[in-house]
A protein has these predicted regions:
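Solvent-exposed, acidic/flexible segments
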Residues: 28, 63, 67, 86-93
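Gly/Gly-Pro-rich "capping" loops immediately C-terminal to redox-active cysteine motifs
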Residues: 32-33, 42-78
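Electrostatic cytochrome c docking/interface patches
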Residues: 16-36, 69
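N-terminal export/targeting leaders of redox proteins
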Residues: 1-25, 106
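C-terminal capping alpha-helices of c-type cytochrome domains
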Residues: 87-106
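Cys/His-enriched microdomains
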Residues: 39
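Surface-exposed patches in mature extracellular/periplasmic domains of secreted proteins
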Residues: 43, 84-85
C-alpha cells in the first residue's frame, strides 16, 4: 500500500512540474505581451521564451532575476534602461516580472 502511495505521489509531482504548461496563466500571458509589445523589452534583452536574442541589455536567461528585482528595475530603470512606471500599470509591471522570472527559471 505504501508503495502505491509513493508512486501516486511521484506521478502527481511529474504532472505538476512537467506536463502542465507554464503558459497557462493569465499573468504569464499579459507579461509576455508587455515584454514583446508594450515595453518592447525584447529590443534589448535576450529571453528564450520570447524568442529575443539582443546583446544590448543583460541576458535574462543567464542572470535569472527574481520577481522583485524585475519589478524594481522595470518601474525605476537602471543604468541606460529607462523607468516604465509612467508607461505601465502596476499590474503590467507585476505581470512582466512574473513572465521574466518564470521563463528565465525554465
Amino acid at each position: 500500500m505504501r508503495k502505491n502511495n509513493f508512486y501516486f505521489l511521484v506521478v502527481i509531482i511529474f504532472i505538476n512540474f512537467f506536463l502542465l504548461p507554464v503558459q497557462s496563466d493569465d499573468m504569464f500571458d499579459l507579461g509576455k505581451d508587455v515584454f514583446l509589445n508594450k515595453a518592447v523589452c525584447s529590443t534589448c534583452h535576450t529571453l528564450a521564451d520570447a524568442g529575443s536574442n539582443s546583446q544590448i541589455g543583460p541576458n535574462l536567461n543567464e542572470i535569472r532575476p527574481d520577481k522583485m528585482t524585475v519589478m524594481n528595475t522595470v518601474a525605476n530603470g537602471i543604468g541606460v534602461m529607462p523607468a516604465y512606471e509612467d508607461q505601465l500599470t502596476p499590474e503590467e509591471i507585476e505581470a512582466v516580472a512574473h513572465y521574466v522570472f518564470t521563463s528565465a527559471a525554465n
